[in-house]
From Swiss-Prot:
Domain of life: Eukaryota
Subunit relationships: Trimers of one alpha 2(I) and two alpha 1(I) chains.
Gene name for this UniProt entry: COL1A2
The keyword Calcium is annotated on this UniProt entry: yes
Glycosylation sites recorded in the entry for this protein: 168, 1206, 1256
Domain text: The C-terminal propeptide, also known as COLFI domain, have crucial roles in tissue growth and repair by controlling both the intracellular assembly of procollagen molecules and the extracellular assembly of collagen fibrils. It binds a calcium ion which is essential for its function.
The UniProt record lists the keyword Transferase: no
Record-listed 5-hydroxylysine modification sites: 168
Protein name: Collagen alpha-2(I) chain
One CC-aspect GO term: extracellular space
UniProt source species: Aquarana catesbeiana
Annotated Gly residues bias: 304-322, 340-349, 403-412, 523-532, 586-595, 619-628, 874-883, 967-976, 1093-1105
InterPro entries tied to this protein: Collagen, Collagen_superfamily, Fib_collagen_C
Length: 1355
């Protein structure tokens, strides 16, 4: 399918090419309206809306566990039923009702697949009007015709098209006042007037729909520590034994049966005063009170609804002429008017409609050569060639350089667990964990005793006087409602009328509280109090309903490397590779066998003369005597040729790392942690359901005048106005611009050919000739382009208001406009409706008890009251006596899930357990919450050219473009043949009387022409320019790896390559044992109140009262969110405990990585020695065979060249390379993107974490001595190294500061390049890395040096 964008591009290009290549072709009819444009990019997110009204109350919460009746009766006295007791006082609120609480908002879902292309959008707005055409060539002036005889009166012609604007006449007399002009455009908003007097309060408006649920307010600061919860049942106190040695963890025993319930403890002391009971039912309405004093005037109310239209006003004065309105639609053709006075000869008419489509023009020039297309896909591998003839065995090559570190081998199977290792020291304290998620809703707590009575609050200001609502009809009698929680304090009743003054009676004794009366009828609404001060921040609301899925999030981060693909097909043999980069240091190999003996060295220098011996007697020639003492060592021989590489040595003995011990016993639960920090603001909740519509409000005051609305649709033509006074003839106007050439009319009848006269000289322009006879009416030409707007006409009479146009189709959503300036201060609005009831004030002092009212009729069931405040902790009951343990029974079948136990006292802090084994990958967590809308993305890169689109359906006709300029006068066409008389049209409205024109000459009677037919539609346009390329598509999945191809020819040995990248992450290990139970999270928010319980009734102590309501709790709802959160936290903790060596999860040292992943091989990994933020992690090479962490220099090679020429004849001395020769730049060790300062910090930590360090430097030489001078046999020309703590490392001297040489190829001046490998190992890591080197034997024109700086390795 062709996309919509392509179609638009095709049409645009078609129009462009058509205009370029077809200048001579006449213009076709105006094309249909183009298809709508693409939807613009998303606007900038708007400002947050104002907080909506509070939503309706949520559904009731889940039922709480039953209360514990243990302290309310004594089982020892329960054998006989007691007498029916009197009705007890109203019980505490019952357990919550059954509907469950609203779940937490789900985690955000994964991004959905891209949706299918949507349907074609609605038609877009009309395109902009086209440019005006170029002026035509000026026509020749016609010859003046002879004046013909006056013809007979012609038939009444059709009303002519309006002529061009006439010349400006002489200023006429002032006409009489015209009719009232059309209303002008809205004026600029005037300044705010002074505030008017307060209007009388309007009637209460209809209750507005509930606003959207307001945002969850910011979390309050951590509250003071709550009162302790009720203590659990006290167990028998055992003697405190001495702490035993930790034993091995035993196997978990089978779950024991529940022991028999213990006897009830003695009755506890009387509890504190109970909570206030629920408000009693309303008593009967009292007599009306005395009329109250007048309330304070209320603030100005909000603007009311627009009032009913007023009566028509008096006619206004004449309005300023409005701007010319848009042309109305053509009226129906009017009846033929009376013949007008013959007008002067009109100018050439406007250009007619385009003629029929001409023949297709010649093909346009070929376009430019297209851009080079993208590279095609790689071709499939060719077939493998035939195997070549086996070559002759080559001679044995020299030993190659150390190979690169091999790729990561497949993970080995997990070894068996070893014996438990010795207990390690306690690890460092871990970082504080992230604040936990909001806990699940807690079970309702036990009712506490009442707090002390609060102080009497200050008197509130007087409220707005409310209007009494109409009394509703009495509802049907409902079932008795359950007792709700105490409701908020009701409003004051209206003052009653003055009663007759009674005689004062004697004060009676205070009566006993009477029984609760039945609910009275609802009293009339009291007067509204004055607006109270803003209440404190309310508690966080219950979690909102599940939000709709959010929009697709931004592209996620790059995913982890995919799993290894399946082997691909054999590839063709590769060509010889280029010389590779320097490889990472290989793992230390075992010692090789001794190489063959080197060639004999040169003879040593002759030894010194021995002491003169005593002369001996001449003896016989003896046999060979024993060998004499060894001579003085000869000069150092040249290095022998390297021996062949020895076989790999046997594996060394196992290291000290023990096998992981068995899992330790589960430690006791830790103490509850402090409450976490306040959570961030929650997402904005959904709007609550719409409330019932209220009573219609009173008519509001008229609003301020609104800004000018958009121009309405053009109304129908009004009735003709009365004829104005004839104005005096105006002055001649300036010459109009040249009109466009009219399209030629059809050919007229051939005239008789006159004799051709000789060309005379051009005469001067003659006077205007008389009008020639009118030609026959030609076929109507096509409608020309709209002319330029004429000068504004006089304001005509305003027509009647047209019918409202149909609603236009909704335009596409525009981009967000810039934020407007703050509006001017508006006038104070009228007094608003009475606000919702403010929070209850503090309880006033208790009044004297009233006399018991008569029992009212039982009221309808009330709505559930708000939850009361939590009471203080009750006194703990006394300890029960210990029951004897029963005999062990057989193991029963699994019982139903028991109720959650009460929170135990915190146990002692357990020892840190050893790290658990790797867990299995967790299941996917529930979808996360919707992310916030992303900011508007930047404009994407241009996309590739899309395929050509199909031609769209013709759009609706566009609106008329602006009038074009007047064209130059065109040539007159020849008269056309007479047309057939057309049907007479309906009579049009009489036009206003025009200005009297000059008397015209009589024209000949013309025949009536035919109506022309509508021209054909123009050709479809050529393809448009290519659209902007679309956004880059998502990367394809990695294809499978092919099988290993045949080996290519051996390349030349490369340089030592740099260290390779770290291998792919190994497979996830088996799941480790569960960790110790973490500290309890902060307490969750209190649960919503439940439904009230049934009435207590009489108490009957039946037999065996050992059952509690809490033994059969209703099934606890599954808490998937908590499970998913715990699983996610476990995974995050495992990631922290077992670092991956990645940039996001670096280890501290390579040793930590090896301990966490013993199966991993050496390679590059990320570490963060100073811990903390991972943004300064460094990439290092981990040598797991030696346990070293190696940091490379940057750069690690110094160019080999002549760095210094000694121009003086002074003796040579050591010159520091970095400080003197290299412009003050010493050797540096830091990653790209990491500053030297950050790297210095990491190196400082690395030195603290290590107790050994080593580094080597390769000195490349040409005619320069690095270590041993072969001529002198001494080390006086050896280089000096500078350590990181400014210590100088030399070839000889103190052994702690001397380096060793692994290979010395720079012992004499040979004119060839050689190298010397220097190594320094130390138990003082602070001396490394090496920062500078000072050679001595340099300065000659033929002396060149360079360096390779090896990695510094810490262990």
């Amino acid at each position: 399918m062709l996309s919509f964008v392509d179609l638009r591009s095709v049409l645009l290009l078609a129009v462009t090419l058509y205009l370029v290549t077809c200048q001579e072709v006449r213009r076709g009819p105006r094309g249909d309206k183009g298809p709508p444009g693409e939807q613009g990019p998303p606007g900038i997110p708007g400002r947050d809306g104002e907080d909506g009204l509070p939503g309706l109350p949520g559904p009731p919460g889940v039922p709480g566990l039953g209360g514990n009746f243990a302290a309310q009766y004594d089982p020892s006295k329960s054998a006989e039923p007691g007498q029916q007791g009197i009705m007890g006082p109203r019980g505490p609120p019952g357990p919550p009702g059954s509907p469950g609480s609203q779940g937490f908002q789900g985690l955000p879902g994964e991004n959905g697949e891209p949706g299918q292309t949507g349907p074609v959008g609605s038609r877009g707005p009309s395109g902009a009007p086209g440019k005006a055409g170029e002026d035509g060539h000026p026509g020749k002036s016609g010859r003046p015709g002879e004046r013909g005889p006056v013809g007979p009166q012609g038939a009444r012609g059709f009303p002519g098209t309006p002529g061009l604007p006439g010349f400006k006449g002489i200023r006429g007399h002032t006409g009489s006042d015209g009719q009232k002009g059309a209303p002008g455009a809205a004026g600029v908003k005037g300044e705010n007037g002074a505030n008017g007097d307060n209007g009388s309060p309007g009637q209460a408006g209809a209750r507005g729909l509930p606003g959207e649920r307001g945002r969850i307010g910011p979390a309050g600061s951590a509250g003071s520590r709550g009162s302790d919860g009720s203590s659990g049942p006290v167990g028998p106190a055992g003697p405190i034994g001495s702490a035993g040695a930790p034993g091995l963890p035993g196997a978990p025993g089978a779950k024991g049966e529940l022991g028999p319930a213990g006897n009830n403890g003695p009755t506890g002391a009387a509890g504190g005063r109970g909570e206030p009971g629920p408000p009693g039912s309303l008593g009967p309405a009292g007599p009306p009170g005395n009329p109250g004093t007048n309330g304070v005037n209320g603030a100005k109310g909000t603007a009311g609804l627009p009032g009913v239209g007023g009566a028509p006003g008096l006619p206004g004065g004449r309005g300023i002429p409005g701007p010319a309105g848009p042309a109305g639609p053509s009226g129906a053709r009017g009846l033929a008017g009376d013949p007008g006075i013959a007008g002067g000869k009109g100018d050439t008419g406007s250009k007619g409609e385009p003629g029929s489509v001409g023949q297709q023009g010649p093909a346009g020039p070929s376009g430019e050569e297209g851009k080079r297309g993208p590279n095609g896909e790689a071709g499939s591998s060719g077939p493998s060639g035939n195997a070549g003839i086996r070559g002759v065995p080559g001679t044995r090559g020299l030993p190659g350089p150390d190979g690169r570190a091999g790729g990561i081998g497949p993970a080995g199977s997990r070894g068996s667990s070893g014996p438990p290792g010795a207990r390690g020291p306690n690890g460092d304290a871990g970082r504080p964990g992230e604040p936990g998620l909001l806990g699940a809703r807690g079970l309702p707590g036990f009712s506490g005793s009442n707090g002390p009575q609060g102080k009497e609050g200050p008197a509130g200001p007087q409220g707005i006087e409310g209007r009494s609502g109409a009394a509703g009809p009495a509802g049907a009698r409902g079932e008795p409602g359950a007792i709700g929680f105490p409701g908020p304090k009701g409003p004051n009743g209206e003052p009653g009328k003055n009663g007759d003054k009674g005689n004062q009676g004697p004060s009676g004794n205070r009566g006993a509280p009477g029984p609760d009366g039945n609910n009275g009828a609802q009293g009339p609404a009291g007067l509204g109090g004055a607006t109270g001060e803003k209440g404190e921040q309310g508690p966080s609301g219950a979690p909102g309903f599940q939000g709709l899925p959010g929009p697709g999030g931004p592209p996620g981060e790059v995913g982890k490397p995919g799993e290894r693909g399946a082997p691909g097909d054999f590839g063709p043999p590769g060509s010889a590779g280029t010389r590779g980069e320097r490889g990472a240091p290989g793992e230390s190999g075992g010692a090789g066998p001794h190489g063959p003996s080197g060639s004999r060295g040169p003879s040593g220098a002759p030894g010194p003369d021995g002491q003169k011996g005593e002369p001996g007697a001449a003896g016989l020639n003896g046999g060979l005597g024993p060998s004499g003492p060894a001579g003085i060592p000869g000069e150092r021989g040249t290095a022998g040729t390297p021996g062949t590489k020895g076989e790999k040595g046997d594996a060394g003995n196992s290291g000290d790392y023990g096998n992981p011990g068995r899992d330790g016993a589960r430690g006791p639960a830790g103490a509850a942690g402090a409450p976490g920090p306040a959570g961030g603001p929650g997402d904005r909740g959904e709007s609550g359901p719409a409330g019932p519509s209220g009573v219609a409000g009173p008519r509001g005051a008229p609003g301020e005048r609104g800004e000018a609305g958009p121009a309405g649709p053009t109304g129908f033509a009004g009735p003709p106005g009365a004829a104005g006074h004839t104005g005096a003839k105006g002055d001649r106007g300036a010459k109009g611009p040249k009109g466009e050439a009219g399209s030629p009319g059809p050919l007229g009848a051939h005239g008789s050919a006159g004799p051709a006269g000789p060309n005379g000289p051009a005469g001067s322009t003659g006077a205007r000739g008389d009008a020639g006879p009118s030609g026959a009416t030609g076929f109507p030409g096509p409608a020309g382009r709209a002319g330029a707007p004429g000068p504004p006409g006089n304001v005509g009479p305003s027509g009647p208001t047209g019918h409202p146009g149909k609603d236009g189709s909704r335009g596409p959503r525009g981009d967000s406009g810039p934020v407007g300036r703050p509006g001017e201060q508006g006038q104070h609005g009228p007094v608003g409706l009475a606000g919702d009831k403010g929070p209850s004030g503090e309880a006033g002092p208790a009044g004297p008890p009233g006399a018991a009212g008569p029992s009212g009729v039982l009221g309808a069931r009330g709505i559930l009251g708000l939850p009361g405040t939590r009471g203080e902790r009750g006194l703990p009951g006394g300890p029960g006596s210990n029951g004897e343990p029963g005999p062990s029974g057989l193991a029963g079948s699994s019982g139903p899930r028991g109720p959650p136990g009460s929170v135990g006292s915190p146990g002692p802090v357990g020892h840190s357990g050893e790290a658990g084994r790797d867990g299995h990958p967790g299941n996917d967590g529930p979808p996360g919450r919707d992310g916030l809308p992303g900011a508007k993305g930047e404009r994407g890169y241009p996309g590739n050219t899309g395929p050509s689109g199909l031609a769209g359906a013709p759009g609706p006709a566009g609106s008329a473009g602006p009038a074009g300029k007047s064209g130059n006068r065109g040539e007159g066409g020849p008269s056309g043949p007479a047309g057939i008389t057309g049907p007479s049209g309906p009579r049009g409205p009489a036009g206003p009387q025009g200005v009297r024109g000059d008397k015209g000459e009589a024209g000949e009677r013309g025949a009536r022409g035919l109506d022309g037919r509508k021209g054909h539609n123009g050709l479809s346009g050529l393809p448009g320019p290519s659209g902007t390329p679309g956004e880059t598509g998502p990367s394809g999945s990695v294809g499978p790896v092919g099988p290993r191809g045949p080996s290519g020819p051996s390349g030349p040995p490369g340089k030592e390559g740099r260290s390779g990248h770290p291998g792919a992450m190994g497979p996830v290990g088996p799941r480790g044992p569960a960790g110790f139970t973490g500290p309890a999270g902060p307490p969750g928010p209190p649960g919503p109140p439940g439904h009230a319980g049934p009435s207590g009734g009489g108490y009957d102590g039946g037999d065996g009262g050992e059952y509690y309501r809490a033994d059969q709790p209703e099934r606890k709802p599954k808490d998937y969110e908590v499970d998913a959160t715990l699983k996610s936290l476990n995974q995050q903790i495992e990631v922290i405990l077992t670092p991956e060596g990645s940039r996001k999860n670096p280890a501290r040292t390579c040793r930590d990585l090896r301990l966490s992943h013993p199966e991993w091989t050496s390679g590059f990994y990320w570490i963060d020695p100073n811990q903390g933020c991972t943004s300064d992690a460094i990439r290092v090479f981990c040598d797991f065979s030696s346990g070293e962490t190696c940091i490379h220099a940057n750069p690690d090679e110094i160019t080999q060249k002549n760095w210094y020429i000694n121009t003086s004849n002074k003796d040579k001395k050591h010159l520091w390379f970095g400080e003197i020769l290299n412009g003050g730049t010493q050797f540096e060790y830091h990653d790209e993107g990491l500053t030297a300062k950050d790297m210095a910090t990491q190196l400082a930590f690395m030195r603290l974490l290590a107790n050994q360090a080593s580094q080597n430097i390769t000195y490349h030489c040409k005619n320069s001595i690095a270590y041993m001078d072969e001529e002198t046999g001494n080390l006086k020309k050896a280089v000096i190294l500078q350590g990181s703590n400014d210590v100088e490392l030399r070839a000889e001297g103190n052994t702690r500061f001397t380096y060793s040489v692994l290979e010395d190829g720079c012992t004499k001046h040979t004119g060839e390049w050689g190298k010397t490998v220097i190594e320094y190992r130390t138990n003082k890591p602070s001396r490394l890395p090496i920062l500078d080197i000072a050679p001595l034997d340099i300065g000659g024109h033929d002396q060149e040096i360079g360096f390779e700086i090896g990695p510094v390795c810490f262990k």
